[in-house]
């Protein structure tokens, strides 16, 4: 399959069960410990109401967050990512000041059998286009120092390391790197 064999779109409010299923699959991936802040054990215990609320919030207009999925011809959700809008003057999850309005990509996942065909770039292209429509000045994401596969995929999607490094939330002896995609104003 190629990236053109998928429909990349925003999730709909009623699709919370599919959101939950894909999240649980992602959290079982071999690199989930360094790719996601949440664990499978925590996620599986969360109430369905949390997934309903996430899906409903993501589907709202206007929204400060939007989740995108890549849907295969057979209806399978092959991958997903979420873009959060961070407002200038707010603080991020580390307590650092957000200096400008920006998108923050989280929850990036593509099922193993759908990797290597350009799908991740198609997801990023759609997410970044939405972020630009929201008036952000750049888009960023964080990636674990040891997640080389993800770093390569992010580079292929146009992201570059910014030089910002933060301690990994689960283990202060490890780091995460900020990657950014910026454009001229």
Question: How should each PLM-predicted stretch be described?
Answer:
Residues 1-7, 185:
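Short, low-complexity, intrinsically disordered N-terminal peptides in bacterial proteins
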Residues 7, 104-106, 139:
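Conserved Rossmann-like nucleotide-binding pocket used by diverse enzymes
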Residues 7-21, 33:
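A short beta-loop-alpha structural element at the N-terminal edge
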Residues 9, 143-144:
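Active-site-adjacent beta-strand anchor residues
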Residues 21-113, 124-126, 130, 167, ...:
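Acetyl-CoA-dependent GNAT
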Residues 107, 111-125, 133-134, 145-152, ...:
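Conserved glycine-rich acetyl-CoA-binding loop
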Residues 137-138, 144-151, 155-185:
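C-terminal "cap" of GNAT-fold acetyltransferases
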């Amino acid at each position: 399959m190629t990236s053109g064999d998928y429909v990349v779109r925003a999730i709909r409010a009623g699709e919370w069960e599919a959101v939950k299923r894909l999240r649980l699959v992602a959290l079982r991936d071999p690199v989930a410990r360094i790719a996601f802040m949440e664990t499978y054990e925590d996620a599986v215990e969360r109430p369905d109401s949390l997934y309903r609320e996430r899906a409903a919030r993501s589907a709202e207009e206007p929204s400060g967050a939007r989740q995108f999925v890549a849907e295969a011809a057979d209806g399978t959700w092959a991958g997903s990512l979420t873009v959060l809008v961070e407002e200038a003057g707010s603080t991020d999850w580390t307590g650092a000041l957000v200096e400008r309005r920006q998108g923050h990509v989280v929850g990036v996942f593509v099922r193993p059998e759908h990797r290597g065909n350009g799908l991740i770039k198609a997801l990023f292209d759609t997410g970044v286009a939405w972020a630009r429509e929201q008036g952000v000045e750049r888009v960023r994401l964080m990636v674990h120092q040891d997640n080389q596969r993800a770093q390569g995929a992010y580079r292929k999607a146009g992201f570059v390391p910014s030089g910002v490094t933060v301690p990994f939330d689960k283990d202060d002896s490890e780091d995460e790197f900020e990657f950014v995609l910026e454009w001229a104003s």
